[in-house]
Swiss-Prot record:
HAMAP family: Thymidylate_kinase. Keywords: ATP-binding, Kinase, Nucleotide biosynthesis, Nucleotide-binding, Transferase. It catalyses: dTMP + ATP = dTDP + ADP. This is Thymidylate kinase. Its EC number is 2.7.4.9. One of its GO terms (biological process) is dTDP biosynthetic process. One of its GO terms (cellular component) is cytosol. It comes from the Bacteria.
Amino acid sequence: MFITFEGIEGSGKSTALQGLAAWLQQHGHGVAVTREPGGSRLGRTLRSILLDLGNTDITPEAELFLYLADRAQHVAQVVRPALDEGMVVLSDRYADSTVVYQGYGRGLDPMMLRQFNDVAVGGLWPDLTILLDLEPEAGLNRALARNIREGMHAAEGRFEAESLAFHTRVREGYLTWAALHGGRYRVVDATQSPEDVVRDVVGIVAAALGDVSSGEAVSGRTGA
């Protein structure tokens, strides 16, 4: 089963993902935890370019193709092999991030981005996408505090430096995209405590795994 986590900056994706991974492992599931950008060796180099606060001059089109390169490598080297081994794959961001950030955020055509991503991932879309939702201002405050605390503001602060208007477009884009793909999307209130968010996520995934065991879902969808 392939599960992705999406949301604006500071929505708590990494915390929720780690909580779910621990629960899955406790219940006997093999788990592969990964992220975008940076899930492969090549991806780590691309991540350093894409998130560096000094690279504010990257054009939307250049940004798009850097993300697509990261994703194509990630799917080929990490995601597909883990799925082939029967593992539950958890990814902190995936193709929907590009559709939303570069589409709704930057103004590129979301449907064109959907097609480009389909090529990059070879038709592999998640079985389940968990969208952690909160107001952009609250998320940015969390993300900025985290980056400063971890000494990563310069190395990974490029998106946090975007305007509140940009992050508002991204948040609205996520909700629009989730509504268009409701079959695989579940929206979780990210203003809750981390423990409550993990509880909600575990409940969603436990139900989805029940569908898998009954043959109603597969490991990786063809089409979004």
